[in-house]
């Protein structure tokens, strides 16, 4: 189920289970994971897309292997805050992942995270080619970290375990 808020997402999350962060792209999908205490987001991997069936299978496998119970997915709003065509593509993919794996997903504004990830890798001294290999998983970690920070600031805790938003 698509969650409407961070609070709803955490109501579906059993304490101690991880959150998978996804930066969805047309060619690549960046992945990040929360730590079990929901303090930090850790870049995980970059998955190169193949086809819908394999993409969904790969993400379902990561959810199982990493004990992730819910998903935060970047929502690529336009700079004016409105949803564009890519938002609809992301939402459709999220619905398919929900159907395949049964997880709850929260779509979080990802504006500027790709630029932030690129800047961070540049400042770390990585060459452009090296940076492009990891930008997506860093973007996924940035989106997930924003959600973790908001949850902590608002005192939101994992209380669920039914994997379904309220």
Swiss-Prot record:
E.C. designation(s): 3.1.-.-
Localization of this protein: Cytoplasm
One GO location term (cellular component): cytosol
Primary location: cytoplasm
Pfam family, one: RuvX
Protein name from the UniProt record: Putative pre-16S rRNA nuclease
Source species, domain of life: Bacteria
Record-linked InterPro entries: RNaseH-like_sf, YqgF, YqgF/RNaseH-like_dom, YqgF/RNaseH-like_dom_sf
Signal peptide region: none
GO MF, one annotated term: nuclease activity
This protein's UniProt keywords: Cytoplasm, Hydrolase, Nuclease, Ribosome biogenesis
Gene Ontology BP annotations: rRNA 5'-end processing
Keyword hit for Transport: no
Job description of the protein: Could be a nuclease involved in processing of the 5'-end of pre-16S rRNA.
Similarity comment text for this entry: Belongs to the YqgF nuclease family.
């Amino acid at each position: 189920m698509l969650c409407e808020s961070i609070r709803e997402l955490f109501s579906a999350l059993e304490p101690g289970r991880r959150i998978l962060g996804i930066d969805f792209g047309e060619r690549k999908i960046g992945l990040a994971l929360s730590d079990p205490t929901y303090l930090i987001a850790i870049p995980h991997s970059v998955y190169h897309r193949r086809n819908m069936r394999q993409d969904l299978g790969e993400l379902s496998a990561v959810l199982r292997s990493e004990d992730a119970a819910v998903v935060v997915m970047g929502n690529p709003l336009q700079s004016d805050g409105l949803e564009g065509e890519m938002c609809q593509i992301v939402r459709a993919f999220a619905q398919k992942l929900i159907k395949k794996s049964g997880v709850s997903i929260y779509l979080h504004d990802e504006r500027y995270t790709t630029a932030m990830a690129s800047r961070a890798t540049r400042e770390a001294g990585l060459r452009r080619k090296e940076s492009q290999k990891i930008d997506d998983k860093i973007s996924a970690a940035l989106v997930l970290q924003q959600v973790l920070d908001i949850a902590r600031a608002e005192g939101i805790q994992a209380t669920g375990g039914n994997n379904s938003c309220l």
